[in-house]
């Protein structure tokens, strides 16, 4: 695996999967926060300690193979251009926080299912991504990597509290489980606000597709647990999965209601968005996201034939500003990005239809 390959292949293997409930659930993510006993927290550490953690991973873990994830490569943030960092964020391989650090790094698996972020808010954050609703499978893979790393380092762990983390909400298991979910039916029926309120009362968090502070573009929401102390990993996963399954049922009911009461209006909305995507010469990010959401809904409901439902996930990533500029070989102005975005979408749809 090379940096060029990571940068030039915008679609990660997990995006091409077709996991359970993938008509509504786009992806499942597990993140484990861990700190090393011998070092201060990342928020307090000095440059020397941050470099020592990088060197430890360079020595012990790069070019090592762990099945089924392949080899691992270490990407240091201060050796990447701002554009390369942005691409990694847009591919969901690193967090925006890590991209902004000077001594952060990412240990990335060949198949891009696993990303271990170094020197972010915690010493390491192990991330595992799967398509569809596969929280248990993602947790199993994350634990496999956790055990692999723990053979070489001693974690900060307290018998009564669990794993010690820089943020109190992560103390305990250090587990953050999240699901990316497409909810156009609940948005169109204006039920989404009530659903979000219920989710939050259950102790869960609802965010946009790039986490804290990001927008829910294209009717895509990220739902995750908040507290980890006093709960087992299995309980956290079971609680989140139960809520997600209820949201899935609510979304299906909302879609059925729209089809029953406003079928021709919905079909018109889908085909108008399809027409914009198939013919536009300039299109901005927000409009593209909304039209792609309509197209995906049309595919799921059977209005649109011959186009893969994965097109929403793929094009939501492919048309992000960083990836567009990476493909262009350098910086682009807003209008140039809008032109390239429209061109890429038209070509992708043409390939699908052929």
Swiss-Prot record:
Binding site for ATP: 27-31, 92, 125, 176-180, 207-212
Key words, A-Z: Allosteric enzyme, ATP-binding, Kinase, Nucleotide-binding, Transferase
Pfam families named in the record: ATP-gua_Ptrans (PF00217)
Gene3D superfamilies per the UniProt record, alphabetical: Glutamine synthetase/guanido kinase, catalytic domain
GO terms classed as biological process: phosphocreatine biosynthetic process
UniProt xrefs under CDD domains: bacterial_phosphagen_kinase (cd07930)
Regulation of its activity: Appears to be allosterically activated by the binding of pArg-containing polypeptides to the pArg-binding pocket localized in the C-terminal domain of McsB.
Record GO terms (molecular function): ATP binding; creatine kinase activity; protein kinase activity
Domain Phosphagen kinase C-terminal: 24-254
Chain ranges for the short sequence motif RDXXRA motif of the pArg binding pocket involved in allosteric regulation as given in the UniProt record: 337-342
EC number of the protein: 2.7.14.1
EC class of the enzyme, as a word: transferase
InterPro entries in the record: Arg_Kinase (IPR023660), ATP-guanido_PTrfase (IPR000749), ATP-guanido_PTrfase_AS (IPR022415), ATP-guanido_PTrfase_cat (IPR022414), Gln_synth/guanido_kin_cat_dom (IPR014746)
GO cellular component: extracellular space
Catalytic activity: L-arginyl-[protein] + ATP = N(omega)-phospho-L-arginyl-[protein] + ADP + H(+)
Highest taxon in the source lineage: Bacteria
Family note: Belongs to the ATP:guanido phosphotransferase family.
Function: Catalyzes the specific phosphorylation of arginine residues in a large number of proteins. Is part of the bacterial stress response system. Protein arginine phosphorylation has a physiologically important role and is involved in the regulation of many critical cellular processes, such as protein homeostasis, motility, competence, and stringent and stress responses, by regulating gene expression and protein activity.
Name listed for the protein in its UniProt record: Protein-arginine kinase
Protein's organism: Bacillus cereus (strain AH187)
Highest classification ranks of the organism: Bacteria, Bacillati, Bacillota, Bacilli, Bacillales
């Amino acid at each position: 695996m090379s940096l060029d390959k990571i940068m030039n292949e915008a679609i990660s293997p997990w995006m091409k999967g077709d996991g359970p409930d993938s008509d509504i659930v786009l992806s499942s993510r597990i993140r484990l926060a861990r700190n090393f006993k011998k070092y201060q927290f990342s928020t307090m550490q000095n440059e020397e300690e941050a470099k020592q953690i990088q060197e430890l991973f360079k020595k012990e873990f790069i070019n090592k193979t762990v099945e089924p994830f392949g080899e691992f490569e270490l990407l240091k943030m201060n050796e990447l251009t701002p554009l390369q960092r942005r691409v990694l964020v847009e591919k969901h391989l690193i967090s925006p926080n890590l991209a902004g650090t000077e001594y952060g790094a990412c240990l990335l698996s060949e198949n891009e299912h696993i990303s271990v972020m170094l020197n972010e808010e915690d010493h390491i954050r192990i991330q595992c991504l799967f398509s569809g609703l596969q929280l248990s499978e993602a947790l199993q893979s994350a634990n496999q990597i956790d055990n692999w790393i723990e053979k070489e380092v001693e974690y900060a762990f307290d018998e009564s509290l669990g794993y010690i983390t820089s943020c109190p909400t992560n103390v305990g298991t250090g587990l953050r489980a999240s699901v990316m979910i497409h909810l156009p039916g609940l948005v169109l029926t204006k039920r989404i606000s009530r659903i979000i309120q219920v989710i939050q009362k259950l102790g869960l968090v609802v965010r946009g597709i790039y986490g804290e502070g990001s927008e829910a573009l294209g009717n895509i929401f990220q739902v995750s647990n908040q507290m980890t102390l006093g709960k087992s990993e299995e309980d956290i996963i079971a609680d989140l999965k139960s809520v997600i399954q209820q949201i899935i049922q609510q979304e299906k009911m909302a879609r059925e209601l729209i089809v029953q009461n406003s079928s021709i209006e919905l079909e018109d909305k889908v085909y108008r968005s399809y027409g914009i995507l198939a013919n536009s010469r300039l299109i901005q990010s927000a409009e593209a996201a909304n039209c792609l959401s309509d197209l995906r809904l049309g595919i799921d409901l059977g209005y649109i034939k011959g186009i893969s439902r994965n097109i929403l996930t793929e094009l939501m990533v492919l048309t992000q500003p960083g990836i567009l500029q990476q493909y262009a070989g350098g910086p682009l102005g807003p209008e140039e990005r809008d032109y390239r975005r429209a061109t890429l979408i038209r070509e992708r749809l043409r390939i699908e239809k052929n």
